UniProtKB/Swiss-Prot annotation:
Domain Radical SAM core, chain residue ranges per copy: 149-393
PROSITE patterns assigned to the protein according to its UniProt record, in alphabetical order: MTTASE_N, MTTASE_RADICAL, RADICAL_SAM, TRAM
CDD domains (alphabetical): Radical_SAM
Catalysis: reaction(s): N(6)-dimethylallyladenosine(37) in tRNA + (sulfur carrier)-SH + AH2 + 2 S-adenosyl-L-methionine = 2-methylsulfanyl-N(6)-dimethylallyladenosine(37) in tRNA + (sulfur carrier)-H + 5'-deoxyadenosine + L-methionine + A + S-adenosyl-L-homocysteine + 2 H(+)
Organism of provenance: Sorangium cellulosum (strain So ce56)
Residue positions binding [4Fe-4S] cluster 2: 163, 167, 170
Residues the record lists as binding [4Fe-4S] cluster 1: 11, 47, 81
E.C. numbers: 2.8.4.3
Superkingdom, taxonomy of origin: Bacteria
Name of the gene: miaB
Gene Ontology CC terms: cytosol
Name of the protein in question: tRNA-2-methylthio-N(6)-dimethylallyladenosine synthase
Length: 498
């Protein structure tokens, strides 16, 4: 059996794409190698959002040249957004690459590898599936099979792909294409299958996930509402349908939304659906109206504040996190000060910060990149300092409280397990990471457990099971089934969304 290995760079969508590549390769008879050195086929699933993505790929391919030379039959595949962006140019520029495959062409990967194995030439396949969008689904273990691995507690489900927003800094519309939506019936069916296999939390994925529309018109609208009613949201209707049709689901998250589509009906869904956790990641990118206009974000600072405030008021205790770019062309010190003041005003409990980098095929490429790199770095450091202070105060305030944590797995590498041995780790409903001490002898995987917060770490919480949770927990069985991993490869660079 040919063996494969996948290395993933970039955003959560890329992680999900890699999981689907695992599925299509396994179904075609490939087996996963223990490491890249043992692989016959090595896939690099690339990200092009950040600066110098092509140079980073060239460096990685150069590093793998010896791996290729060791055996003539080894195959190097480049997938993801750099593959979509560069296409056949990659084959001409880097002769070590055998196959280039775009995100929409993942189902064709086994066939491309098969053609190559019988003497075919290196090939690039980067065609958007505009007429008949294909959405690869997860393949959970059968709930009826006692020998099947347990499903991971968390899973990702794609509801749409592509983006129509066309923010001036973003290459995603070029690498992922226009928005295409998946029928809600298919989405609900996939989530139901995951939950039946043991998954407790599902995250809905889309480049601008809350702009979702059912292509078959199967979701109900509010009485009297029209399709173009700005207060309505088919995405909110999708959330309601999942909540109603999959009652065993513990938590339903989504990423990445766009502030323009944070409608009153979506706010109301958050207020009324217990399955939606009290945390939303809502990218803002800048706190300056002048910069937001140059970014073509199509909202003002005041509109962002008003919409997120409505959400927080509707769901007491809800926390927000965000994405911010510093050093966008023309950003002044006053513009950056406006961003810092927005961070304080909204009170973000987490953020992903990035230095602006010029990307091909983006409108901002025409603007002078006039903020010096040193200034960008200094502003990013100040942004993180502000964010760290807000997070520290938030985590400290939780000490002594009781929280519900969805246990996602064992945390053996952190080295601060309690008396019960290895540590369990999970997230609260507000997305705080919690490490549970002194419960190594219990089987908590996939359970929503009540914990008492003992102390705050820099980016997480240290917790202990309450007496009631400990009494209700199952003892850990030696030799029991291990969960199937939720993520088989780790993203090495976070990418801004929304």
């Amino acid at each position: 059996m040919p063996r494969y290995s996948i290395t993933t760079f970039g955003c959560q969508m890329n992680v999900h794409d890699s999981e689907r590549m695992h599925d299509v390769l396994r179904c075609a008879g490939y087996t996963e190698a223990g490491s890249a050195d043992e692989a016959d086929v090595l896939v690099l699933n690339t990200c092009s959002v950040r600066e110098k993505a092509e140079q980073k790929l060239r460096s990685e391919v150069g590093r793998l040249a010896r791996w290729k030379r060791e055996r003539a039959d080894r195959v190097l595949v480049v997938a993801g957004c750099v593959a979509q962006q560069e296409g056949e140019r990659l084959l001409k520029q880097m002769r070590a690459i055998d196959v280039v495959v775009g995100p929409d062409n993942i189902p064709e990967l086994p066939g491309l590898l098969g053609d190559l194995a019988i003497g075919g030439l290196p090939i690039a396949r980067t065609v958007f599936d505009l007429d008949a969008p294909r959405f690869l689904v997860a393949s959970p273990p059968s709930p009826s099979s006692s020998s099947s691995p347990r499903a991971a507690p968390t899973a990702f489900v794609t509801v749409m792909k592509g983006c129509d927003e066309r923010c001036s800094f973003c290459i995603v519309p070029h690498t992922r294409g226009p928005e295409r939506y998946r029928p809600s019936d298919e989405i609900v069916a996939e989530i139901a299958a995951l939950v039946a296999a043991g998954t407790r939390e599902v995250t809905l994925l889309g480049q601008t996930v809350n702009s979702y529309r059912d292509p078959l018109g199967a979701l109900p609208r509010a009485p009297g509402a029209s399709a173009d009613d700005p207060d309505e949201s088919e995405f909110a209707a999708l959330l309601r349908r999942v909540a109603a049709d999959v009652p065993g689901l513990a938590r339903l998250r989504y990423t990445s939304p766009h502030p323009r589509h944070l409608t009153p009906s979506l706010v109301l869904a958050h207020a009324e659906l217990p399955v939606l956790p009290r945390h939303v990641h809502m990218p803002v990118q800048s706190g300056s109206d002048r910069v937001l206009r140059r970014m073509i974000r199509r909202y003002t600072r005041a509109e962002y504040v008003a919409r997120t405030r409505a959400l927080v008021e509707a769901v007491p205790g809800l926390t927000l996190s965000t994405d911010i770019i510093v050093g966008f062309p023309g950003e002044t010190e006053d513009d950056f000060a406006a961003t810092l003041s927005l961070v304080r005003e909204v009170g973000f409990k987490g953020l992903f910060g990035f230095k602006y980098s010029r990307r091909p095929h983006t409108p901002a490429l025409k603007l002078p990149d006039d903020v010096p790199e040193g200034v960008k770095g200094e502003r990013l450091a100040r942004l993180f300092e502000e964010s760290e202070a807000l997070l520290a105060a938030h985590l400290s305030a939780l000490v002594g409280t009781t929280q519900e944590v969805l246990v996602e797995g064992r945390d053996k590498e952190r080295g601060h397990g309690g008396a019960g041995g290895a540590l369990w780790s999970g997230r609260t409903g507000r997305h705080e990471i919690a490490h549970i001490d002194g419960a190594g002898e219990l089987d908590l995987l996939g359970e929503v457990v009540e914990v008492s917060i003992a102390r705050a770490n820099k980016h997480s919480l240290q917790a202990e099971l309450t007496e009631a949770a400990r009494a209700a927990a199952r003892p850990r069985q030696r030799g029991g089934l291990e969960p199937r991993p939720a993520r088989r490869s780790l993203p090495v660079v976070a990418a801004e969304g929304g």
